[in-house]
Swiss-Prot record:
Top-level division of the source organism's lineage: Bacteria
Function: Could be a nuclease involved in processing of the 5'-end of pre-16S rRNA.
Protein name according to UniProt: Putative pre-16S rRNA nuclease
TM stretches of this protein: none
Length: 139
């Protein structure tokens, strides 16, 4: 049973997928956001191709724990995914994941232009690994 993670950005969506044993997260793709309908259609195909049974969505709240406009957008996307695709969506606190992703990409000596494109995918990996690690503690 695979888990898919989504890091919803302003222009791009980062995607990461777990291995079938739900131990390791790996980066999958970065999609340009071209509207909700396009996103859900592409996501539905991805869910079928990878036999995803659970989706984790980065939950953007401020460092002080307050919700904002992006939080509302992410909630809306979660509701859309659940209603159209029929897979439960769980939220994972994504505070500082973009900064952590940027650091990983810098350490990997990735060029600035490519870093900008890859940071959402790397953030999705961090979100998913955080979720997988916390799930393994529950069992």
């Amino acid at each position: 049973m695979r888990v898919l993670a989504i890091d919803w950005g302003e222009k791009y969506v980062g995607l990461a997928i777990s291995d079938p044993l739900r131990i390791i997260a790996q980066g999958l793709d970065v999609w340009e956001i071209k509207g909700e309908e396009d996103f859900v259609s592409r996501l539905k195909r991805l869910v079928e191709d990878y036999q995803v049974k659970e989706i984790v969505l980065g939950y953007p709240i401020s460092l002080r724990g307050h919700e904002n406009e992006r939080t509302q957008k992410v909630r809306h996307i979660a509701e859309l995914i659940e209603s159209v695709i029929g897979i439960p969506v769980k939220f994972v606190d994504e505070r500082l994941t973009t900064m952590e992703a940027e650091k990983v990409l810098l350490e990997g000596d990735i060029k600035r232009k490519k870093r900008k494109l890859l940071k959402n995918k790397q953030a999705a990996v961090i979100i998913l690994q955080k979720y997988l690690d916390s799930s393994s503690l529950d069992t």
